[in-house]
Amino acid sequence: MSAICYNTAMQKPEILAPAGNPTALEAALQSGADAVYLGLDAFNMRARSSANFTREGLADASRRCRERGAKLYLTLNSIIFQGELAAAEEMLAFAKPHIDAAIIADWGVAAICRRLSIPFHISTQMSCSNSEAALFMKAQGASRVVLARECTLAEVEEIVRTAGIETECFVHGAQCVAESGRCLLSHDAYGCSANRGECHQPCRRRFLVKAIDRFADADGNPIHDADAEFEVTPHTVLSAKDLCSLPFIDKLMAAGISSFKIEGRARTAEYVRTVVSAYREAVDAVMDGSFTPALADRLVEKTKNVFHREFSVGLYFGRPGADQFTDAEDSSARQVKRQVGVVIDYFLKAGMAQVKIQDQPISLGDTIQVQGPTTGVHEFAVTSLRRDEEILETAERGTWATLPAPRCRVGDRVFRIDPAPSHPRSLSASRTSSMASLV
């Protein structure tokens, strides 16, 4: 199929990648991210998780980004209470030399950013869903707005055309069932507020439906039987599919969006590597005129190898229907990684890694990954295995082996990549639809 041609004056959007740890950060930069966003230990929407950086790590992340010509944004986008203003200001003052902007969701934090002369972006949590809101936010000093996920493509185009401010839109990753992510379910069920970075993701779980009304027989006797309670299984009823915009990335670029945001600070380094590289290739192909539906299909298939909960087009082409919700209880990834061991030496001239096999064995022909905070993520096939002068077919647990490998470091973790167990579909075909039919 022939390539799709576009105006050569089209703006090339920034690819904004998530980083929950130094390995993911390195993977993002290696894969072509133009910018990275991360959080510290408080005041962000992943504050509950381990997917955050230390203050020392922030300085190192800033150095790495600047060496690669990439920007770095700090997420400080949770609700801030009165007693936390001083701590939030102290965090921003510390971060100022290391970041290009802060992503915020509180007008008090906006005031602090203005006082400290820190550029700030309005988080999607603030539901900027129209041009008047964008103009107001611009007037308050915002340099960018992350548009509400509820915006359709037509609405995005109109906001971009009329607001005169940088716009950022999510293009890939998890979607919250709540309006702009402002969910109260976790707080109601567990006392942990998603709006404070403490989401327990109850929407991803299965549910029981219990009949409250009591029924009686013809003689007026109460009926108490097991049918009064129903298990909604194996389906999920609130779990949204992941967004994937690769099939219509050209349309998003034509809309003039400034930055394409990939969700996933709590996801793995190989997820970041795979997804960022897919969007890098897609955006570059649109710019040079080589983008085709066949290329989009290939890139979608590539992203299916890593964590996702099936894919949908989000709300870009209309309000959500039943087909926007997943029937998968966990990841639908086509591949899984299994711990093999660690790198215990690397011979630079020979391009050989010495690996201690602590868990799963590796054999000739296996695909493995090496991951580390400086190495990032390398994935490659095992083409030879040796132990001293002995040529091996398999390196078993409790042994060691040397093998050809890209540059890696002592302490890097080694994984074997296997096909994932199949995920049986548990909902009827009427609940699913192809992405292609919607775009």
Where are these regions (language model features)?
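Surface-exposed amphipathic alpha-helical tracts and adjacent flexible/coil segments at the periphery
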Residues: 6-31, 35-47, 59-62, 68-83, ...
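Short glycine-enriched loops at secondary-structure junctions
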Residues: 21, 78, 105-109, 126-128
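Short coil/turn segments at secondary-structure boundaries
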Residues: 49-52, 79-86, 101
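Aromatic-lined substrate-binding rim segments of carbohydrate-active enzymes
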Residues: 52-56, 65
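Well-ordered mid-protein domain cores that form the structural environment of catalytic cofactors
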Residues: 86-123
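Conserved nucleotide-cofactor-binding alpha/beta core module
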Residues: 130-132
